[in-house]
Amino acid sequence: MSTFSLKIIRVGITVLVVVLAVIAIFNVWAFYTESPWTRDAKFTADVVAIAPDVSGLLTEVPVKDNQLVQKGQILFVIDQPRYQQALAEAEADVAYYQTLAAEKQRESSRRHRLGIQALSQEEIDQASNVLQTVQHQLAKAIAVRDLARLDLERTTVRAPAEGWVTNLNVHAGEFINRGATAVALVKKDTFYILAYLEETKLEGVKPGYRAEITPLGSNRILHGTVDSISAGVTNSSSSADSKGLATIDNNLEWVRLAQRVPVKIHLDSEDQQYLYPAGTTATVVITGPNDRDPHQASPMTKLMHRLREFG
């Protein structure tokens, strides 16, 4: 084979390799830009901070950390005898003022029947004033009794919804103050995704669009629907000085970092069964109005789907 032919073959191979490289780079670029996506997404759920409405010693904590509880199930009980005694005293006051009010009512009615022929107007008015005072005291006693009854009811703290007890940090015998968070309850069937997408990718994101969610380290692909896009994020480049004037950070004009915007994605109901703890990471791809058919993807596309998980 002549030297000229070898040169032709070498040039042809080089051109072929370059063309294949360009095609591969174009396909990878198209894959990464055809759908808005991010690796910065978090599983999130509705979390209820459980705190008692009364103070006292904890006498019962019948649940364990990370336990699934039903709505209305007892989480913990605060020492009740003190609140039972307060209710008993309040009920005794109500009974006393009810008896006294009935007596003053009879006396006032009797004086009104006798009239000014037998009694002075001052005595009649005095009986009416005493009755009003006793009725006012009775109303206050009833309010105190109702509050004491409410306090007694709230010594038993129940789960407001079905969910998982998380970060249980109290035990029987401890004293707990009113309003102090004792445990967090992660509500069941409330899991959703917060995907932090760059502002340059928001053009392809709309409420109602479908999304693919791949938990970090998992081969399972979950599906969801875009619920909403955050209406605002913090402007980290601007702040106020001690006099209230705007302070703008210096910025290099040729370096413009895209701001990330939270996008809320609701998981499909059939995917709520897969338990990925709130706060864990996932990769999210917005596929548009419809889901993608995984059976139509080429092996190369499937490989790039997997590589996207790692960047």
From Swiss-Prot:
The keyword Transport applies. SUPFAM superfamilies: HlyD-like secretion proteins. It comes from the Bacteria. It is found in: Cell inner membrane. GO terms for biological process: transmembrane transport. The gene is aaeA. Belongs to the membrane fusion protein (MFP) (TC 8.A.1) family. The chain crosses the membrane at residues 11-31. Forms an efflux pump with AaeB. GO terms for molecular function: transmembrane transporter activity. This is p-hydroxybenzoic acid efflux pump subunit AaeA.
